[in-house]
């Protein structure tokens, strides 16, 4: 049954060249990424690495992310999204954890995302910083 899902993650957008290398017609890309990085599925995962994807409504394509999922709640209420860069302390902590998967991570590539969406439709791609 469909309901709202809330996620809070430290997020790294997987580069297109990696996606292009893994993509094939026989398997779902998300399954290939789970195998490639040997991480858990995102459902109910907390304090661990997972793969998430989201539909980018601007280009109608999916974006894929390696996330350190801090929190997951099924049955949350309402749609919202917040994205910010990590503080220096957060970046120092999480960039070390992500170094297991990627050697060099730029200061602006890791983001803290906190959002809720209705899972009866495609999960949105939550990564871009919005200027106010």
Regions found by a protein language model. Name each.
Residues 1-42, 114-119, 127-132:
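Short, extreme N-terminal segment that most often corresponds to the first beta-strand
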Residues 29-77:
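Low-complexity, serine/threonine/proline-enriched polar segments
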Residues 57-132:
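Charged interaction segments
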């Amino acid at each position: 049954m469909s309901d709202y899902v809330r996620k809070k993650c430290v997020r790294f957008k997987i580069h297109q060249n990696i996606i292009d290398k893994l993509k094939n017609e026989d398997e779902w890309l998300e399954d290939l990424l789970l195998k490639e990085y040997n991480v858990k599925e995102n459902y109910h995962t907390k304090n661990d690495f997972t793969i998430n994807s989201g539909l980018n409504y601007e280009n109608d394509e999916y974006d894929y992310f390696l996330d350190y999922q801090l929190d997951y709640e099924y049955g949350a209420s309402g749609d919202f999204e917040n994205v910010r860069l990590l503080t220096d302390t957060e970046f120092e902590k999480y960039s070390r954890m992500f170094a297991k998967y990627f050697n060099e991570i730029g200061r602006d590539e890791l983001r803290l995302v906190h959002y809720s969406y209705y899972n009866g439709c495609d999960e949105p791609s939550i990564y871009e910083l919005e200027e106010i």
